[in-house]
Design a protein with these regions (language model features):
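Short linear sequence motif anchored by a di-proline
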Residues: 1-131
Length: 131
């Protein structure tokens, strides 16, 4: 994961800000700390209310193994401050993935300023505790 707020500062990510991708998902998982040190945790499944697919803002790069010359396509999911629901679940760092509204998919891929997407997704996420 990469914090969207610090992309320009981090050497691992600043050269890839223009390498944008959508990471498509139907759900994701987060852990809630039950105790102060995180030794006891509760796993949650997070999805949209309508169970539709959604997209995270991502960056990609190609890593080339210097020995074999084999190329591997890699990606990272961007994170931002948590919305109310995710702050309750991801209660240690209070972060969440950058979930893009449907109308923002094209804008993200076309290179709009990444800082314009540094906001917590506010609608229709449901979290279900898992055994």
């Amino acid at each position: 994961n990469a914090r969207i707020e610090t992309l320009e500062e981090k050497p691992a990510f600043k050269n890839y800000i223009t390498n944008r991708c959508l990471v498509i998902a139907t759900q994701f998982y987060e852990w809630q700390w039950i105790d102060e040190k995180g030794k006891s945790k509760q796993k949650y499944s997070v999805r949209s209310e309508d169970s539709e697919i959604f997209c995270f803002a991502g960056l990609y790069s190609v890593w080339q193994d210097p020995e074999s010359n084999y190329s591997i396509l890699t990606y990272t999911i961007l994170t931002t401050e948590a919305n109310e629901l995710m702050a309750e679940i991801h209660n240690n760092k209070k972060r969440m993935p950058v979930v893009l509204n449907n109308e923002h998919h094209g804008l993200w891929l076309q290179g709009e300023n990444f800082k314009d997407f540094a906001y917590p997704y506010q609608s229709d996420l449901l979290a279900t505790p898992l055994p």
